[in-house]
Amino acid sequence: MEQYSILGRIGEGAHGIVFKAKHIETGETVALKKVALRKLEEGIPNQALREIKALQEIEDNQHVVKLKDFFPHGTGFVLVFDFMLSDLSEVIRNYQRPLTPAQVKCYMMMLLKGVAFLHHNNIMHRDLKPANLLISPSGHLKVADFGLARLFSNQGERLYSHQVATRWYRAPELLYGARKYDEGVDLWAVGCIFGELLNSSPLFPGENDIEQLCCVLRVLGTPTQDSWPEIVELPDYNKITFKENPAIPLEEIVPDTSSQAIDLLYKFLVYPSKQRCSARQVGNRKWSPGPEVMFSRVRVQ
C-alpha cells in the first residue's frame, strides 16, 4: 500500500471502499478497492473472490475494467483497477447535458462489445446496470463490478441463485425464481439499460420483486404458455397470478425513438431467454437510434 498515494475517496460498495490514488513511482492514477475482512476466520468474501476470479479468467479488453493488481493489506486486501472518471448512471442523470442519439449509440456499441467479450469467455456478469458501467476520462465505457459474476456452461445443468442483478434490471425468469438460467439474464439487463439511455429514466422501476414483475407485465403484456413455454417450469409460476394484460407498444414507452432502435429494444426485451439477441449478433447489425450517424465519427465527450 505504501507504493500508492491516496488522492481521495470515490465511493463505497457492499464489500469495500474505493479510493482514487496515484502510484508514487510511475505517477499512474488508479482506483483502489479496499476490502476488509470482518472476521479473519471467515476468509475472503465470496463476492470478492468471484470478482478476482472472473477478472483473472479474461484477457485485457478495452471494454472491461482491468484488474491491475491485488495484494493483502492489514486485515483485508486491496484490488487495483484502472481509474474511471464516472459511471453511466451519472451520465444519464446529467439533465444539463441530455444524451444525443449519437452518444446513445456510442455507449451501446461499447457495452455490447464488452458483454460479447464476457459471454465469449463463458462469463455471466449477473449485475449489469448503469452504475456498473464505468466511464474513463477519455469517454470509453467499461464493464465493472464482477462481484456476482459466474462462469457458465452451455450444458444448462448447473443451479444458480435467483437473487442476483439489481431489481430494475432483473430478467423475468429471475423474478419467477429461476435457478437454471443462462447469459440471457445479461441480455435482458442490456435491453433495460438501452431503454434507460433512450428515455433518461428506468423502464421498469419496481420497488419490490412483485411490483417489479408487475412493471414488466404492464409493458410487455402477461406471458402465456404460447409466448413463453418455459414459464410453467419456473419455481414461482404458480405462487402468484396476474390478470391478462395486453402489451403496450414500446414506441409509447420510449417516444421520439427511431424504428431501428425500437426494433433492437424488442430483441432484448423478450420473455424467452433463448430468443434474446446476443451481444455479438447486435454488434454486427447496422442500426441508428435517431439521425443517421456513422459510429466512427462519434466522439463521447
What is the predicted function of each stretch?
Residues 17:
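Conserved N-lobe ATP-binding subsite of Hanks-type protein kinase domains
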Residues 160-174:
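Conserved activation segment of eukaryotic-like protein kinases, specifically the C-terminal portion
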Residues 119-136:
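Catalytic-loop of the protein kinase fold
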Residues 222-267:
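C-terminal lobe substrate-recognition/regulatory segment of protein kinase catalytic domains
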Residues 66-75, 85:
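Short beta-strand micro-motifs within the conserved protein kinase catalytic domain, predominantly
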Residues 29, 34-60:
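Conserved N-lobe beta3->alphaC-helix segment of eukaryotic protein kinase catalytic domains
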Residues 107-108:
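Activation segment signature within eukaryotic-like protein kinase domains
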